[in-house]
Amino acid sequence: MFVDSVEIIIASGKGGPGMVSFRREKFVIKGGPDGGDGGDGGDVYFEVDNNTDTLASFRGTKHHKAKNGAPGGTRNCAGKKGEDKIIVVPPGTQVFVDDALWLDLVEPKERVLALKGGKGGLGNAHFKSATKQQPTYAQKGLEGVEKCVRLELKLIADIGLVGFPNAGKSTLISTISNAKPKIANYEFTTLVPNLGVVSVDEKSEFLMADIPGIIEGASEGKGLGISFLKHIERTKVLAFVLDASRLDLGIKEQYQRLRLELEKFSPALANKPFGVLLNKCDVVENIDEMAKDFCTFLNLEAQKLEAFGLEPYLGFLHPHLTSDFENNPNEKSALFVLPLSALSALNTHALKFVLLEALP
């Protein structure tokens, strides 16, 4: 089950109480105080685990508390510190307190201290003085800290797929990566985001994210896309997946409507480097002319993608690819326009290299 938002209560441990005791030895009638200090309460940490990409483990487990510190002992023995609570979260988890961002956990194996445990109380040995040789009191341990927090997951991926329902995004990610999403010939087959690792060669790989299809009005809450657009906010490059076979909505209109929804949701998201994939090209006549015309529409002065071992349908590549985005952050031209067929794996092998080259 994919879960990307939960509310939990976290609490650090209470400090253990100090001990009231006196030294007892043979022939010693009144030994001095020797009560030990209480142990500190356990701390609460958040730890990033790369092996998970959902917050589903928090369903049904609302309270997460560290252990209390142990009481102090006799003979000046300090109590044991309470056991820490390690809360494991997927990379990209944000922690909110009262709707304000508190922690943003993105680094693999990152461990962040969230709450410090209460300090253990002092034993009566600390309170001996010239006028008080036999103190009969010790400190209580300090209380721990409790917070109600909301965990929000924003997946971290290199490439984010954007498209209308049934454009073939799920088929594409299943073809070129290790992801195994549900695939069917109807809209909204994808109900949750999917992550897949794309292996290009023995040394190179990148992470791809597929979110549920976007419909018009998604930025205003229609359909499923708005709930998951946040999952492509962290991606480095967007890939617009357009259905070249649609008769009711051309590729230019598909692109314009998708971009409009992104701009409404987040201008920063809409300004990310991007490329365009013309899917289902194997059932379209004159796909090369369609791709050339689309490049003109995008004002893309492109060169053919002959170096990537393409199938009969050629793609088009922005000259110098990523350097233009690095040197001109306001550049809006596409990095590539590539006809392909996810179903028949046409040009999908070349796509891996194109996407790898497109990454900053």
Swiss-Prot record:
One Pfam entry for this protein is MMR_HSR1
GO CC annotations on file: cytoplasm
- What GO molecular function annotations does the UniProt record carry, in alphabetical order? GTP binding; GTPase activity; magnesium ion binding
Q: Name the coenzymes or cofactors required.
A: Mg(2+)
* Annotated ranges, domain Obg: 1-156
Where in or outside the cell? Cytoplasm
Which positions bind GTP?
A: 163-170, 188-192, 210-213, 279-282, 341-343
Q: Does the keyword Magnesium apply?
A: yes
Q: What is its EC number?
A: 3.6.5.-
Please give a single GO biological process term from the UniProt record.
Answer: ribosome biogenesis
What function does the entry list? An essential GTPase which binds GTP, GDP and possibly (p)ppGpp with moderate affinity, with high nucleotide exchange rates and a fairly low GTP hydrolysis rate. Plays a role in control of the cell cycle, stress response, ribosome biogenesis and in those bacteria that undergo differentiation, in morphogenesis control.
Q: HAMAP family under this entry? A: GTPase_Obg
Quaternary structure and interacting proteins, as annotated: Monomer.
Family the entry assigns = Belongs to the TRAFAC class OBG-HflX-like GTPase superfamily. OBG GTPase family.
Q: What is this protein called?
A: GTPase Obg
Record organism: Helicobacter pylori (strain Shi470)
- Gene behind the chain: obg
